[in-house]
């Protein structure tokens, strides 16, 4: 069984790590993958939200403990939500991943911390081809344009910008399917991240 592990990390809080994990888990489940969502954040937002929506997606299983053999035999898509810090747990999650998604906002703190975030990822043993920046909720401000410019100049791997969506957040928080009531063009932007 082919497996793919995605870790979503940034040591800045509030950048959309959990939302991206929830989105990936639900889309993967809709595409027939057996999803293991791992919540390493002490706030447990990923686990709590998945408990609400697990009845809708039988291929998303909520467990509090797991042994390695069970995980290897029963899942083919791993999504790992992380806490905003730098520690050994984070290093292990980064090393485990086939892909590391790094949500980046169009703000000053994202810009000044970007190099430090990527250095930490690369120093944890993640290759440059594995780390993908996700432009999350970029607004049309001068600062956001500066962030975009830096991303382009540095030749980082960058996913298309995810739009701010109150509907996405509301659907996920209420345990509904992520795309409930969304127009097709809205859905397409989020599905592109998954593919």
Task: Please give the residue ranges for each predicted region.
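Acidic-aromatic/histidine active-site loop/patch
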Residues: 1-5, 194-195
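P-loop/Walker-type NTP enzyme "switch/lid" segment
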Residues: 5-15, 22, 26-80, 84-91, ...
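Hydrophobic anchor at the start of a short beta-strand
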Residues: 34-35, 78, 100, 128-131, ...
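Conserved C-terminal guanine-recognition region of P-loop GTPase G domains, centered on the G4
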Residues: 112-128
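Beta-strand-loop-alpha "switch" segments that mediate conformational coupling across diverse proteins
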Residues: 137-179
């Amino acid at each position: 069984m082919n497996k793919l592990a995605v870790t979503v990390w940034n040591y800045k809080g509030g950048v959309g790590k959990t939302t991206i994990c929830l989105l990936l888990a639900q889309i993967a489940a809709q595409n027939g993958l057996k999803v293991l969502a791992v919540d390493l954040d002490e706030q447990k937002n990923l686990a709590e939200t998945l408990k609400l929506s697990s009845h809708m997606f039988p291929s998303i299983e909520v467990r509090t403990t797991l042994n390695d053999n069970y995980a290897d035999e029963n899942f083919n898509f791993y999504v790992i939500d992380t806490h905003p810090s730098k520690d050994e747990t984070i290093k292990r999650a980064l090393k485990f991943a086939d892909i590391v998604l790094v949500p980046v906002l169009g703000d000053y703190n994202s810009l000044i911390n970007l190099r430090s975030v990527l250095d930490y990822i690369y120093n944890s043993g993640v290759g440059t081809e594995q780390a993908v920046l996700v432009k999350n909720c970029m607004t049309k401000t001068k600062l956001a344009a500066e962030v975009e410019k830096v991303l382009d100049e540095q030749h980082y791997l960058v996913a298309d910008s995810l739009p701010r969506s109150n509907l996405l957040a509301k659907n996920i928080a209420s345990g509904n399917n992520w795309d409930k009531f969304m127009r097709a063009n809205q859905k397409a932007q989020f599905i592109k991240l998954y593919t």
